[in-house]
Amino acid sequence: MGKNVLLLGSGFVAQPVIDTLAANDDINVTVACRTLANAQALAKPSGSKAISLDVTDDSALDKVLADNDVVISLIPYTFHPNVVKSAIRTKTDVVTSSYISPALRELEPEIVKAGITVMNEIGLDPGIDHLYAVKTIDEVHRAGGKLKSFLSYCGGLPAPEDSDNPLGYKFSWSSRGVLLALRNSAKYWKDGKIETVSSEDLMATAKPYFIYPGYAFVCYPNRDSTLFKDLYHIPEAETVIRGTLRYQGFPEFVKALVDMGMLKDDANEIFSKPIAWNEALKQYLGAKSTSKEDLIASIDSKATWKDDEDRERILSGFAWLGLFSDAKITPRGNALDTLCARLEELMQYEDNERDMVVLQHKFGIEWADGTTETRTSTLVDYGKVGGYSSMAATVGYPVAIATKFVLDGTIKGPGLLAPYSPEINDPIMKELKDKYGIYLKEKTVA
C-alpha cells in the first residue's frame, strides 16, 4: 500500500525531491502544478503521477490532500498558509523549505489542535545552514563555552570557470527574485549594537570575504539577522550576521543599476513597447540622444564610481548587455522586469556548465577560562553536468529526507517545526552525509 506524498510546485528544486522519494518502494509521489504539462515533465523520470491543481481552489486542494499523508509545498511562500489551512482540515502533514512566516505562526494553535506536523526551513539556506549552526552552538554550550560572534554567509554561484559575464552570476531560475533581494534593507548585531543598512546602501556595504584563496568572494548582509540570537539560543553573542556571497565586482555593477533606477518596478510607459534599448535608456535617463557618449554622460550624472577602472569595467558590462545598442527591449511594463528579461536571455546556464554552492559559518568562541577559539564550518559543492544543479541538490535532498522522516515518525509534531534542535537535526545531517556526501567541513582556525 505505502505512503502517499503530494508535491506542489514546478521549480528547479522539485526534480531531486520527486526522484529521491519515488525511489522508495513504499512511497507513492503525486506531482501537482497549475499547468499539467509541467507536472508531467517532472513526474516522468520516476514514473510518478501528475495532476493539475490550483492551490487557491480550497475544495480542490482539500480533495487532493485528503488522499495524501504528506504535502510538500515548493510553491512561493505566500501560498503556504493556504496549503497549511487545507492540511489542518484534512489532517495532512506538511514539509516546506521556506522560513516560518508570521502568517504560518498565526496558524500554530490550529496546527497543534489538528495533531499535524508542519516541518519548515529545511532546504539549503534556510536548512543545511541551521543544521551545522545548531550543532556547533550546542557543542560549545555543552562544554561550558560562550558564542561571542556568529557569521554565516551563503551563495549560489556559477562555478568559477563558468562565471564568464560582467556580473559573475547566472540564473537557474527567475532573475526577478534575485534582483528584488538586492532591494532589501538589512539589520544585524555588531559588537553588541544593532546596525541597520538601508536598501539603497546595501551594495555599498559589500566587502571582500575570505574563505579559500581560490575564490574572490564579497559578502553583504541579509535582511534581519537579529532574530537568530533567539532562534539559535545565543543571547551572549555580540555579533550575529547572516549574509550573501557573490563574486567580486557584482555589488558595484548592481549599485550602478540601482543608481540608474533600473531596479524600480513601478509601471513606466517607456518599457511598455518594443523600442531599442538605447532609445529606452535615452528616455528613461533623460539623455540628449541615443549615442553611446550621451547615454554614458547620463549614467555618469546618476552613478557614483569607486574609481575609473571600475567605471570602465561596469560600462563595458552595460555594453555587453546591449543597453547602448539598437537591440529591441522585451517590454514588461517597468524597468526591473524589462531588465530581467534581458538578463535571462544572456545569463542562463548552458548544458555543459556547472553551478556551485558555498556556505560558511564562522564561530567566535570564548571558553570558561577566558581563552578564545575560532571555528569554521564550510561547504563547497558543485552541480553535476547532465545531473542536478548544486542548488537543486542542496535544497532538494534535505526536503526529501525531512519528508521521509515525517512519514516514518522520526520527525514528529504536532506543531510548527524547524531544524533548531539536535533531535530534529542529527538524523537529517547523518543521512545527508552518508547517502549524498553533503556536509560541512569543520575546522578550528584560530
From Swiss-Prot:
GO terms for molecular function: saccharopine dehydrogenase (NADP+, L-glutamate-forming) activity; saccharopine dehydrogenase activity. Present with 57500 molecules/cell in log phase SD medium. This is Saccharopine dehydrogenase [NADP(+), L-glutamate-forming]. The keyword Metal-binding does not apply. Keywords: Amino-acid biosynthesis, Lysine biosynthesis, NADP, Oxidoreductase. Pathway: Amino-acid biosynthesis; L-lysine biosynthesis via AAA pathway; L-lysine from L-alpha-aminoadipate (fungal route): step 2/3. Signal peptide: none annotated. NADP(+) binds at residues 10-13, 33-35, 54-55, 75, 97-98, 124-126, 174. Interacts with TRM112. GO terms for biological process: lysine biosynthetic process via aminoadipic acid. Its EC number is 1.5.1.10. One of its GO terms (cellular component) is cytoplasm. It comes from Saccharomyces cerevisiae (strain ATCC 204508 / S288c) (Baker's yeast). L-saccharopine binds at S98, Y99, D125, R223, T244, L245, R246. It catalyses: L-saccharopine + NADP(+) + H2O = (S)-2-amino-6-oxohexanoate + L-glutamate + NADPH + H(+). Belongs to the saccharopine dehydrogenase family.
